[in-house]
Amino acid sequence: MQWRGAGLWWPRRRQQQQQQQPPPPAFGPPAAAMVPPSRGVSPGLGGRPTSALLFLCYLNFVPSLGRQTSLTTSVLPRTEQSTTYADFIYFTAFEGSVRNVSEVSVEYLCSQPCVVHLEAVVSSEFRSSIPVYKKRWRNEKHLHTSRTQTVHVKFPSIMVYRDDYLIRHPISVSTVILRAWITHWHSGGGLNVRGEENLLHAVAKNYTLLQTVPPFERPFKDHQVCLEWNMDYLWSLWANRIPQCPLESDAVALLSFPYASSGENTGIVKKLQNFQNRELEATRSQRVDYPMVTISLWLYLLHYCEASLCGILYFVDSNEMYGTPSVFLTEDGSLHIQMHLVKGEDLAVKTKFTIPLKEWCRLDISFNGGQIVVTASIGWDLKSYHNQTISFHEDFYYNDTAGYFIIGGSRYVAGIEGFFGPVKYYRLRSLHPAQVLNPFLEKELAEQIKLYYERCTEVQDIISSYAATVQVGGERRETCDFHNSYLDLKRKYGRAEVCRGLPWEKELRDRHPSLFQSLLQMDLLTVPWNQNDSVLEIGARIFEKAVKRLSGVDGLHQISSAIPFLMDSSCCGYHKASYYLTVFYETGLNGPRDQLQGMLYSLVGGQGSERLSSMNLGYKHYQGVDSYPLDWELSYAYYSNIATKTPLDQHTLQGDQAYVETIRLKDDEILKVQTKEDGDVFMWLKHEATRGNAAAQQRLAQMLFWGQQGVAKNPEAAIEWYAKGALETEDPALIYDYAIVLFKGQGVKKNRRLALELMKKAASKGLHQAVNGLGWYYHKFRKNYAKAAKYWLKAEEMGNPDASYNLGVLYLDGIFPGVPGRNLTLAGEYFHKAAQGGHIEGTLWCSLYYITGNLETFPRDPEKAVVWAKHVAEKNGYLGHVIRKGLNAYLEGLWHEALLYYVLAAETGIEVSQTNLAHICEERPDLAGRYLGVNCVWRYYNFSVFQIDAPSFAYLKMGDLYYYGHQNQSQDLELSVQMYAQAALDGDSQGFFNLAALIEEGAVIPHHILEFLEIDPSLHSSNTSILQELYERCWSLSNEESLSPCSLAWLYLHLRLLWGAVLHSALIYFLGTFLLSVVIAWMVLYLQYISASGSSPAPAWVSADPTSSTPSPAVPPAADASDHDPPMMANGPEPRG
């Protein structure tokens, strides 16, 4: 096999387990002259000892800074020096550094016919002794005479020029050796002899070093070509840029925080990319058939594998096959290590040792070609537990970028039951365990996990012994009572029986007082006999007792007394209690916050596959909050586990489940229609359904089947209404629903014949769900894929998402009629179409494609994979049940219970519960402040705005909190603007109004926010222009028919602008002058009037005779007026003071 790559690479022979074949060595001066005998031969030059010694001599003879040297040595014995001493060779490089053409002067003397050799050898970081120039010539005539010849040594362009549009990858060389030697023609040094053998016959030799030039200090080459203008322009943009290699290492942290593996078919998916560093990437590519990697991971196993294999860490290639390396756990606790061979087969080996249970163990597995070294170390001091070396004579195929790694389970294999600690992966190095750097950073949390299971082992032993003792005693008493009447008389009249004391010391009883109290108060005779089932059943009873205490009127007061019982329930494997403890510790609900204990119980619940615990872990890693690291792949592992259970849970008739509905406590209209079995809405629907109203029958059946709108889940009653509606009405939806129930036998005996008739009847009425149902029938029961595809294509054209998903399944399984083989691309397209229509399984397939990135149409996007899996997981009925209990408590005014259940739901990361909890805390700040150890309003509104589907009012709330500041949170106008802008972008008029109000107060809206709102800052450069745009958008989005605050603000702004325009125009000066003139004239006339009134007590035209009230009609008015000095002012303006 050979190294793969371009350039001056040497062929590499396959390295077997015990034998290594090095690349050909370089050559140098004689070993006898320079190398001490004690050093021996270098291990890397074992292929040709003589040539290796010569190369070492050359290396030892290289001066550290010298450019030229003239040294002549002889390889013949000293007794023969007189015959060969005349032979010599010198040369001078006129330019001490590497150039495209370097002129070299060679001076030599031959005593016999000879051949003169000149050679240039270069070395780089990864390759050495590569000849790049060779020249030789004969000298037969000019003997015993010094000769000088000038040689123009031409080096490759990639060594002497910078990279440009033609020289894409110049080589950075570390050493350039120019060497020359003379061989006699008749002594085995002819032209037909290869260079390596020629050097052995050299009678004189010499060398010099040429100084190398770094790639970015080299000149550009004139290629004598004319570039197109676009190429020339692009070249000018980056011609003088010096790229910098990113800091890159082959060590990859696949996992840094503990992962709770539930032993199911979900795990962490990690995909490695090519190295950006060209040298690292070249090394990785060359080792495709010779892996040198190291895996280091921490494990805490609870149980060995129940199946034949359980996934630990394995590689899945692009063909969905296991690759190299793949590590599994077996049912007896040993390791199963599997490799894929170059020839296409697979090879596996099983370790001779087993992994210990309930101990933190570090596994270090190193691959060095065909050799595998497995080391298991126990505890934090890495006390060696076992070491095993396995050797193969096969070539392993290794390409860590042509697929993805999985930690834990997948759809191919279940994962281990336990916990993963940090996982480190060295891509290019085979390391000894002492060289591996993989510390457990969360050591305190790991210690708590170990202590928890030690305590739980003790609790389970107590419960098992106690239950067994009580049950055996009860069974014996029942048996004796049935068969022996004499004992009846003895118990009645004899001495009372005394129970035998249970074998527990006082110290043990003191450590578990709540457990013994629960056991004494519990009727254990009804507990199942099986040990695991009995422990779980007792845990469930302890939990119900604790929850009953928490559900009282003052339930939050009882949290501290309920915690010991919840701990006992958690130890019994009933992990609903674990989630309660998680929330209590992480939120400080009526107690101090303890993040470490919160993480502990969250991980324990996740390991037990508890739905709400897994969603809590997924959410915390998705957002990176509460000291959980941001890790989308880890978040996906938790969310996908619950998402895959959600469709199964929805079709499970038993269990505390309810439909997840988006009901906001601030929406009074929605709250009014919430009902119960004795509520007005339900009773009215039942009345209408009894009268034969098909719509009422369907709605009533849906409410009872799924547990919607406050009605408890009751599948049996729902099926009765489905049957009544299907058989009595012609409504196609009811007919279809009842047909599905009959097909699946959900709460009723299966009746495939009647179901098919009803399905055909509904399809004939044009119901696309029924058309899809017919396709499902022919696919599942008849295996008639052609007919199934026909119905599904028809239903898909009608817009049915189920049909899109089913068509995708046909392509995925490779059974689509007329299409040979599988077509994953088309399957992915149909799954994506189904997911966009709300299909749960289609969404799950899309999330899987996004996390693996194995389909070209689904580029790897871990964040999008988490979003899609989270969307499905939040439809889980067990979460819906908790939300419904909180809503019912709120409607009934039970504040303690409402707060408890909404905190439990909000910590899973579902947005509607987060905003509802914040609303409760706003309504009852006294309750939140007293019992919650977190800033409730701030925490949950802040959580909600980081959701994908966050409501606009949450952005407005956070904007207000940033604007005013809230409790310990400081004011932040910049973030306030961002929140208001996001609300405005979501179409909320209040967001535009608040932004305008900030501008009115003097705040400045950054340009990127304006561009975010699609407001061009160049067109709206002034605050006035921006205000106009904001108020206009606010008015256009307002839902009020009458005048709204937005319209009034817009009108007021324009009035101000109009008034400002008037004040700044020329007309104002004219009007001002005119009014001033009028006022002055009036003042003068008024003063004249006052002075005239003071000299004459009555006007001249007024008669002194009181009987005369008017002037004489004989006097004309004009003449009458002219006879008096003061003018008549009866019609003048009234004075205004």
Swiss-Prot record:
Annotated keywords: Glycoprotein, Membrane, Phosphoprotein, Repeat, Transmembrane, Transmembrane helix
Transmembrane segment boundaries: 1067-1087
Amino acid composition bias (Low complexity), ranges on this chain: 1102-1120
Keyword Membrane: yes
Gene Ontology CC terms: membrane
SUPFAM superfamilies documented for this protein: HCP-like (SSF81901)
Chain residue ranges for the region called Disordered: 1-42, 1100-1137
Compartments where found: Membrane
Pfam families attached to this UniProt entry: Sel1 (PF08238)
Glycan attachment residues as annotated in the record: 206, 387, 942
Topology of this chain in the membrane: Single-pass membrane protein
Protein name: Protein sel-1 homolog 3
Naturally occurring in which organism (per UniProt): Mus musculus (Mouse)
